[in-house]
Amino acid sequence: MIEADRLVSAGVISEEEVIDRAIRPKMLAEYVGQPVVREQMEIFIKAAMMRGDALDHLLIFGPPGLGKTTLANIVANEMGVNLRTTSGPVLEKAGDLAALLTNLEPHDVLFIDEIHRLSPVVEEVLYPAMEDYQLDIMIGEGPAARSIKLDLPPFTLIGATTRAGSLTSPLRDRFGIVQRLEFYRVEDLQHIVGRSAACLGLPLSDEGALEIARRARGTPRIANRLLRRVRDFAEVRAGGEMSGDVASRALDMLSVDSEGFDYMDRKLLLAIIDKFTGGPVGLDNLAAAIGEERETIEDVLEPYLIQQGFIQRTPRGRMATQHAYKHFGITREG
């Protein structure tokens, strides 16, 4: 799959998880960026602790790589409770969810990543658990089957999703707190990269951190990945020095340009500009032109390009914007 091969993919790569845990902020005081979310969560957490209550159920949504799992960990740490982690696709049966819920201590946090992928059967079990702290369990089979209710301790469910619109209304309505994570500003990413470098003991200059931040597509996960690749380049080609110039040379070598675009982003944009005179072009024609599946374009390639104003999605197809022409130094005809 193309996403796993891209340096600027916002998806998590398995070997990164151990390093990411080591550099992940643990408390709100260490959490950089998302000022509105940070301020609101600080108030909600303190209020819940003052009352001696569990925090209201929390839904976190936004593009991948922006720190939804990090925020869930911070909530548990701030509340001083345990965090149990799972994901929507893993919870195949109602019993899978019941096993997690019955092992929670009072005020514990249950974090469900990709919550939009819960099966309807599991979701039905979740409703009374969230609303009334009760678990309905079927005992036996056939005519002899009966339902019993188990009381659960007060707990906090944190759901994370990249597709909030895919959640059913009954599930979405049961979250008392809803937070959207936005793409990060360059200055916040610079701070994050600098902190990560310090945690890893890397001699990264302020200029080097800024260069990485500029090309990280507003995403901390990508910024930390680029930091590690710049480190590799610096160790082999620059005697370990991680200056702005070294970072720029490293990222140029890796074909990550000033906007954070890689070869696939450029291939897509240039296909629209060169092969279809800027568009509009239908998705199937565009997919054939660059040799990719339409799902790859829709889910992987174009979201960031649209968000940054390089592609416009119209009823007649995709169009390259003036911003895209300017990026490549191409004069738009007509």
From Swiss-Prot:
Family per record: Belongs to the RuvB family.
Sequence segments annotated as region (Large ATPase domain (RuvB-L)): 4-184
Reactions catalysed, as given in the entry: ATP + H2O = ADP + phosphate + H(+)
Protein name (Swiss-Prot/TrEMBL): Holliday junction branch migration complex subunit RuvB
Domain notes per entry: Has 3 domains, the large (RuvB-L) and small ATPase (RuvB-S) domains and the C-terminal head (RuvB-H) domain. The head domain binds DNA, while the ATPase domains jointly bind ATP, ADP or are empty depending on the state of the subunit in the translocation cycle. During a single DNA translocation step the structure of each domain remains the same, but their relative positions change.
BP-aspect Gene Ontology terms: DNA recombination; DNA repair
Entry's EC annotation: 3.6.4.-
CDD domains listed in its UniProt record: AAA (cd00009)
Gene it is expressed from: ruvB
Region Head domain (RuvB-H), residue ranges: 258-334
Positions with a binding annotation for DNA: R294, R313, R318
Any Gene Ontology CC annotation: cytoplasm
Oligomer status and interactors: Homohexamer. Forms an RuvA(8)-RuvB(12)-Holliday junction (HJ) complex. HJ DNA is sandwiched between 2 RuvA tetramers; dsDNA enters through RuvA and exits via RuvB. An RuvB hexamer assembles on each DNA strand where it exits the tetramer. Each RuvB hexamer is contacted by two RuvA subunits (via domain III) on 2 adjacent RuvB subunits; this complex drives branch migration. In the full resolvosome a probable DNA-RuvA(4)-RuvB(12)-RuvC(2) complex forms which resolves the HJ.
Subcellular location: Cytoplasm
Main location: cytoplasm
